[in-house]
């Protein structure tokens, strides 16, 4: 009897929880293998086994021993722990452990507004597909959750001066500086934004801003200052404070790494991002409520980040998830609403179940097969040339690399030279002589393959079924 009363009283909460959790499981069909994941995992396993925090390179023959800004060290340890517990299922477990709490946070913060317009909630939660682009076991998924908490705490205090949640932001900052230091500046950056806007008081056509109390202004400013200090609580100290700005200021790195590329109208795969922008703009324009200036600024900042780099569209979705429901009016339920939610949730869950074997295969799939790896280990190269995207898998297999996904590490040493060599640009032959490679692991995706193929000084000693070739340099 008590159970029936509980179910009746909390019917829509239970339906939404079922829908959100099943949707997150359905999202796992987008999980994939990622080269960077493999060096994150290897670093994490090393730190767990040796009870240390890596701060100098141990994976490359070229930059071995050089200082490495391991700004994601704690994420790597966590990934290593997930691997030790879940084995080949660790990527799925890692993604679910972060995606489910994030979506539940969005639900519980907006619960009353969600219940007043369930159809819109269905549309919005379906748009979590924007989070699917980089669904793999990497530190940015932890950043997604930390960003959600940051925006929630700040907005909650902005609307409610008695809220105490904002005082958790320094702790969030410390966690961020160790899980994913490249984004650890966001708590104080957003706090400064809230501080500035708290002074504004105007009402102009569709946009308004209401001045906040002196106490709120002081708290926003103090939280920003404390968060600035907290960024430095990490194994690298003050270097972490300036790291995000140095990293984002590296134009060569930003322009050559695919996940950092700009959003482009000429790329059909980016169309959904522009549809998302239009969708939110229509919500603002058609809403009967005035647009709060703080919401507009958060929207514009998040859009700027997304347009600057496709990897930041997840940030846009997360930030707007704590804003958009305010502008949606109530809608009367029809008798089919709950059946739609339950039906879709069941479909997502069945999709996950039936695709499970393929998902597991995809998240453990490697570009370089075992035969090729064994051949490299057999020849024991001292100065192997490898492609940037293959470095993670080679590190995972205990093979020393010339370069890998840690572009921030290599940018001071050989990153530009690698780019020129791989595409046979500029004085690439002099660069090849400079590094004295003894073996080359390549495929036909880069111009360097054509050069090796047509040069008598390079002998092909292996061709793998995976499309990889090993060339040996012979004088």
Task: Cite the ranges covered by each PLM segment.
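Membrane-interface alpha helices of multi-pass inner-membrane proteins
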Residues: 24, 127-131, 153, 166-183, ...
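Transmembrane catalytic cores of multi-pass membrane glycosyltransferases
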Residues: 33-36, 48-53, 181-286
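Transmembrane-helix motifs of polytopic, lipid-linked glycan transferases
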Residues: 93-113
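Transmembrane-helix signature of polytopic, membrane-embedded enzymes
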Residues: 106-129, 144
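Short acidic/glycine- and proline-prone juxtamembrane loop motifs at membrane-interface regions
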Residues: 134-142
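Membrane-interface transmembrane helices that cradle and orient dolichyl/undecaprenyl
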Residues: 150-166, 200, 282-290
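Signature aromatic-anchored transmembrane alpha helix within multi-pass, membrane-resident enzymes
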Residues: 224-225, 322, 329-354
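Short periplasmic/luminal acceptor-recognition loop of GT-C membrane glycosyltransferases, typified by
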Residues: 377-415, 433, 437-445
């Amino acid at each position: 009897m008590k159970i029936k009363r509980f179910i009746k009283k909390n019917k829509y909460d239970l339906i939404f929880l079922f829908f959100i959790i099943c949707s997150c499981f359905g999202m796992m069909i987008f999980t994939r293998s990622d080269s960077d994941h493999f060096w994150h995992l290897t670093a994490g396993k090393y730190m767990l086994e040796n009870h240390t925090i890596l701060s100098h390179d141990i994976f490359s023959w070229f930059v071995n021993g050089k200082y490495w800004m391991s700004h994601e060290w704690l994420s790597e340890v966590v990934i290593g722990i997930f691997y030790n517990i879940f084995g080949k299922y660790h990527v799925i477990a890692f993604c679910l452990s972060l995606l489910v709490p994030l979506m539940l946070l969005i639900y519980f913060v907006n619960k009353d507004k969600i219940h007043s317009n369930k159809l819109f909630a269905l549309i919005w939660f379906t748009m979590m597909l924007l989070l699917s682009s980089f669904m793999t076991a990497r530190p940015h998924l932890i950043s997604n959750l930390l960003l959600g908490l940051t925006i929630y705490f700040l907005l909650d205090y902005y609307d409610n001066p008695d809220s105490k949640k904002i005082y958790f932001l320094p702790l969030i900052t410390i966690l961020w500086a160790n899980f994913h230091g490249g984004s650890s500046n966001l708590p104080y950056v957003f706090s400064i934004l809230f501080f500035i806007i708290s002074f504004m008081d105007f009402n102009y056509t569709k946009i308004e801003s209401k001045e906040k109390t002196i106490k709120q202004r002081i708290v926003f400013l103090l939280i920003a200052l404390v968060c600035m200090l907290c960024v430095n609580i990490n194994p690298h100290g003050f270097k972490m404070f300036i790291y995000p700005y140095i990293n984002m200021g590296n134009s060569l790195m930003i322009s050559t790494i695919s996940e950092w590329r700009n959003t482009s109208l000429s790329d059909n795969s980016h169309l959904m991002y522009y549809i998302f922008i239009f969708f939110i703009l229509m919500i603002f324009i058609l809403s009967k409520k005035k647009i709060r200036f703080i919401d507009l600024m958060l929207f514009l900042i998040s859009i700027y980040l997304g347009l600057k780099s496709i990897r930041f569209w997840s940030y846009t979705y997360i930030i707007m998830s704590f804003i958009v429901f305010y502008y949606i009016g109530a809608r009367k339920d029809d008798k089919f609403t709950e059946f739609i939610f339950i039906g879709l949730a069941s479909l997502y869950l069945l999709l996950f179940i039936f695709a499970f074997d393929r998902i597991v295969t995809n998240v453990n799939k490697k570009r370089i097969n075992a035969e090729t790896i064994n051949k490299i280990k057999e020849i024991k190269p001292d100065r192997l040339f490898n492609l940037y995207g293959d470095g993670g898998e080679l590190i995972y297999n205990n093979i020393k690399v010339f370069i890998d996904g840690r572009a921030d590490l290599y940018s001071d040493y050989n990153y530009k030279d690698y780019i020129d060599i791989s595409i046979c640009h500029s004085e690439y032959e002099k660069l090849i002589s400079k590094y004295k490679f003894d073996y080359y692991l390549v495929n036909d995706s880069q111009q360097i393959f054509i050069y090796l193929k047509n040069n008598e000084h390079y002998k092909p000693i292996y061709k793998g079924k995976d499309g990889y070739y090993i060339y040996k340099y012979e004088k």
